[in-house]
């Protein structure tokens, strides 16, 4: 690529342009394929004794063929050597040797057998007499089968004294006996790909491991490779059993800081990142070498990750069971494991001895835990204890037929999903271990990826069993899938605790489940079945109990709206944890602040998580409440492997090595081996020793128990209140009461963190108030009714005077039978400058009856006079509206004839004639005088003159032609039409021309207006235009009214109601009852909203539907009885003839809510509601008067008798047994009527009364009092017939003490009778 030659190399290998003269020789081993392999970084030929004409160089390595004869010089690749240049590599020194091959940046391209070349990158100069080959950055690509050679180390390697090839950065790809790579050697008999093995491929070196196919010659032995962390295989080293190695859990450094093991070449040491688990690809020792030492070495192999340093290019967690699937990229492990402190050596950036404290402390704490077996705890619970995430612990096969076929695939998929979760969690662990900077970087990356993740609804979702496995299951198996888990990477997961039915998603499990049925949102919520229509019942489908785990759930600062991930803020996390525990219907399980993992249990599915974003907000008030609750003892947070070590736990060394841990690891969760089973017998020997004041005397004990200072519930704390002087001590109780009162006011005050607004039934708004004591305030919204006269009671009285009110046929509620309401009545209360005055004035002109000062008996004359009067009023009103517009044009015009025409627009013929005479246009003054005469001859002559001008081609002034057109009586028809004036004048000006100069005698006023509207389109949102349209519609007024109401809001509710009622009662237009009631409902509601209850009640009387009128009037009176019974509005109820029963019932309801039961009964009696009055006496008034009665004066009982006497005799005969009990009881107490009939009536009625109303609190107490009175009367008289009534007396609703006393009296009477006998 950059080294062009005749036989130049390509980027990933050389392309030979010469034809080979010989074929590849047979390999020396049957395992070696006779082909030329090209690796990722160059050609790696393992063909021994091969004659290749053109050995090509790769990108990073060059081909070397030991014992081969090169026919032409080898051309180097991108970083390869050039022949005949004995110079060093990139940083290598020049060697004084006889060889002509130099080291390259990434290795040597040695084509000779015995030569001494310079070292590669970072290698020192070598002056070695023996044959030496140099190591490159990625190792040498040599096939030298010479055991006496010595190769120098690569980038970080040290020279070895053994006859082995030099190690590269990622290991050697050679066939020498022993190779030492940077991360260890892996010399096997099989080929290795970039990330693992690929059987059947050529023996080419991998990216991160060596793939040296060892082919020893005759007489040579094959060396074994070091696979343990120390670079040697101690299973092959003979040593005494007494020389036991140190414990694998002990520190690698002794007291003096020296390593127990000899330092090995760094190339030979394989390290593992934090995300790695137990290595699964460590080779086992040979069976023939089994010994104690070998077994210890096996343990070392299994735990080498916990003692290996965390290097830059340490491989991630290997998964050998995934059929060659690679792990996470190594660069991720490098950047996810930044060191907080790094002290490099002089010659290496890695420590040569010792190990990383982070790797030792946090690599995998599960290996340092003791094995505890508890049958009562499942493996899933233990897994949640360590990581907070669920995992599948067992696989329940749905059918025996697919157990042998699908089990391996299912296990692989399950492990894959779990490993992805573990790798991500371990990356988070490294973030928290390495400090805030790495946490910020990770959060930044997560934030950048969040937008991309949200773009795809199914991005990051996974489930177990996987969708592929589910597709292979039958419908019967899908109906009950156990251990189903579904989640989303970075969001959380759901573990269903019962079998789920997945038959509804057989169309596509991936499309139906991921992001459609199960939705994990970035708002820390999860939703299953977002569509309620498709949501099954509880217990079906996915709507079963489950355990939900949400990730990255942190408290949010209320001010900055940013999550608080600093775990040192214990107070904030405690408050946040308390909020999570108090979530309703989400049974809290655990919360891990390191990672923000929140686990909880739900019984069914809806939207779960932080549904309300304010639940995660933490402010100073929450922290102050936490502090006000008293100083709690500091609790040590139980941390997992994600916990961050403190600075005191870290000891850094300055000699180039990392410090080791000191002390005990606090992050290890200690579990007890067992928990003893306790029974009641275990507590028999334990004596309670309460520190309470007790006494054997019951009286003294009650005094002690009643004392607030010695209460067992009183909190014992020292007095720390303000006590600055003697006044505080003297009035401490008073100060405490004041403080308590302030505290109560503060607690009762509404202090919600959010703003709110709520409408009440009275059309009032309840809002938050930060000033008032209650924290809320009631506000009234502004009404649309802006007409002030509506708020005047005088206007309401005038309206009531103009209507006739009668009772309806089906109910006693009022109805307006006749009305003489006119638009002009409202004009008297309006200001002439208001915007509504012109509208109501026009309506009065068009719709109100016209009155004239004289009478006539001829109907035709009357109609003509009425028409003329209305026409005159209408044109006068229009002139007043267009006057300013025309006057402005007259002032701006200099043409006298044009000014004459403008005067005619104002129907001012006098001024127009005067101007015509002054301007020497006398003929025009004569013609103008005929305007408005409606003479047919004048109209014909004017029309004839216009035709002559048109046919003769005469040039005539347009203003003169306009005047002639007005004389013709059809200004907007025929020749010289004035429709072109539409762009110059308003539509009201043109309408005035039609009304003033049209054929008014031939047509009615409505028809004349309609003819003009047919020629011009009026603006639909102009209320004046709408009124003209309604006036011209005549018979179709209601239809046009509905269309206008649907199209525009030009007419307000009040005007529409007034228009309909005026036209309906005057008989000028016809409106249906439905249209009238619709307008009445709307106007009455608007008046009620404006607190004009009297006006609303008056308008409601216009309703035609009797049932609707009854409901509306009743609701209004019952709700607003207080305002309607006020002194200013009391006459309205009488004038509107509201039923008295409704008024008194409404007042009684008000008294009941206020607790005035006596007034309630009195109002019910006044309203003749005897049934309601009887119920009120039985349940409320009677028991209360009896319980509050003074036995001496009996005033309350006398009041009760007066109330009962107000019932008419016809109603007294209908009394129930319950109210009759009070009447008989009053006779017994007030009148001393103690006859047997009275007592029997009381006893029998008392039982019925009690059984029927015992749910009322006052009734039970009242019956007890009356029963005691009955028993006392009987016992005082010593009635001889008492023996017959003993059973009945004991059935009275007496208390237990009273019944016991009564039984005792009966027993004494029995003993007396026996003694006498």
Swiss-Prot record:
The modification Phosphothreonine is found at residue 751. Residues 257-270, 418-427 have a biased composition (Basic and acidic residues). PROSITE patterns: NUP_C. One of its GO terms (biological process) is NLS-bearing protein import into nucleus. The keyword Transport applies. Its EC number is 3.4.21.-. Present with 4630 molecules/cell in log phase SD medium. Belongs to the nucleoporin GLFG family. This is Nucleoporin NUP145. It comes from Saccharomyces cerevisiae (strain ATCC 204508 / S288c) (Baker's yeast). The lineage of its organism: Eukaryota, Fungi, Dikarya, Ascomycota, Saccharomycotina. The gene is NUP145.
